[in-house]
């Protein structure tokens, strides 16, 4: 348990969180801009959740020895992973059970003080439809891969939450 506590209090653990989220964001932008796969509004919301994971990793990386910083990073990590998983599950449900009367919106519904799609449209403007499945790998859709990714983040958070919040030795 002590080695898990030491790892949870290290820059390495928070760096892995940040770098893995950065890799996911990079892949999303590659799919969008290089492969020309249009992201839907649910994809954009998941992208925001991944940015939350990136932010949590960077936040914890700044001062991993500080218990308050770790707690705030852990809070952002848990919220982002759970919210992302919820969104990925909803997207896969929309894709597997399309309903012409229940579609996703064309524009994201960000708060008025956080209009990401207007500030950075190349990253946050949805241009695709939620029911489209433009890409699969090993017979698994992108939405299903995101369920896997967010589940891993959530399971890692569950494994690390107690060691993260323990006092440093």
From Swiss-Prot:
Domain of life: Bacteria
Subcellular location: Cell inner membrane
Disulfide bonds: 40-43, 104-130
Location (main, coarse): membrane
UniProt topological domain (Cytoplasmic) ranges: 1-13, 65-71, 164-169
Swiss-Prot/TrEMBL keywords: Cell inner membrane, Cell membrane, Chaperone, Disulfide bond, Electron transport, Membrane, Oxidoreductase, Redox-active center, Transmembrane, Transmembrane helix, Transport
SUPFAM superfamilies: DsbB-like
Keyword Cytoplasm set for record: no
GO cellular component, one term: plasma membrane
Transmembrane segments: 14-30, 49-64, 72-89, 145-163
Side of membrane Periplasmic, spans: 31-48, 90-144
GO molecular function, one term: protein-disulfide reductase activity
Keyword hit for Cell wall biogenesis/degradation: no
Membrane topology: Multi-pass membrane protein
GO biological process per UniProt: protein folding
Its biological purpose: Required for disulfide bond formation in some periplasmic proteins. Acts by oxidizing the DsbA protein.
Family stated for the protein in its record: Belongs to the DsbB family.
Name used for this protein in its record: Disulfide bond formation protein B
Organism: Shewanella amazonensis (strain ATCC BAA-1098 / SB2B)
Lineage per the UniProt record: Bacteria, Pseudomonadati, Pseudomonadota, Gammaproteobacteria, Alteromonadales
């Amino acid at each position: 348990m002590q080695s898990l506590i030491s790892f949870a209090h290290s820059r390495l653990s928070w760096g892995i969180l940040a770098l893995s989220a950065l890799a996911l964001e990079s892949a999303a932008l590659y799919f969008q801009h290089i492969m020309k796969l249009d992201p839907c509004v649910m994809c954009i919301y998941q992208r925001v959740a991944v940015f939350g994971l990136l932010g949590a990793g960077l936040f914890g990386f700044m001062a991993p020895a500080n218990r308050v910083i770790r707690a705030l990073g852990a809070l952002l990590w848990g919220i982002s992973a759970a919210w992302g998983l919820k969104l990925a599950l909803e997207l896969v449900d929309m894709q597997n059970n399309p309903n012409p009367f229940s579609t996703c919106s064309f524009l994201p519904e960000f708060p008025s003080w956080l209009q990401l799609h207007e500030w950075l449209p190349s990253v946050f403007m949805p241009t695709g439809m939620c029911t489209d499945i433009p890409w699969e790998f090993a017979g698994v859709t992108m939405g299903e891969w995101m369920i896997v990714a967010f589940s891993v983040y959530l399971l890692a958070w569950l494994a690390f939450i107690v060691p993260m919040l323990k006092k440093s030795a």
